[in-house]
Amino acid sequence: MTVIVYSKPACQYCVKAKDLLERLGYEYTEKVITKDISLEEFFKELGKPVRTVPQIVIAGEHIGSYNELTEYFADKGKINYKGEII
């Protein structure tokens, strides 16, 4: 399963998202905006402009930010709504 994390340096929620993915056993590719990918390429890959990072894509599905990532895994029964692994 392909997981992409679009991030920026010194982003607290980017660190949290990557930590959650690692704790759940997911491997991911990180694309740091303005280092690995331009802002224009970032918007093009997502298909729409967004204002926050991280932005996570799992198996081609745009999940969204850290909060949406926790909701995604909570809905799948992998974590509770506090972000704790079940």
For each feature predicted by the language model, list its residue ranges:
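Alpha-helical elements of the RecA-like P-loop NTPase motor core of helicases
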Residues: V15, E40, N67, E71
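Structural micro-motif
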Residues: G47-V57, Y66-N67
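Local sequence-structure signature of Cys/Sec-based thiol-disulfide redox active-site neighborhoods
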Residues: M1-T29
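Non-catalytic interaction surface on structured domains
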Residues: L24-T29, E45-L46, I58, E71-Y72
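Conserved residues at beta->alpha junctions
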Residues: K8, I33, G60
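Short alpha-helical
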Residues: Q12, I37, G64
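Thioredoxin-like thiol-disulfide oxidoreductase module
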Residues: V32-V50
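Non-catalytic, surface beta->alpha helical segment in thiol-disulfide oxidoreductase systems
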Residues: I58-I86
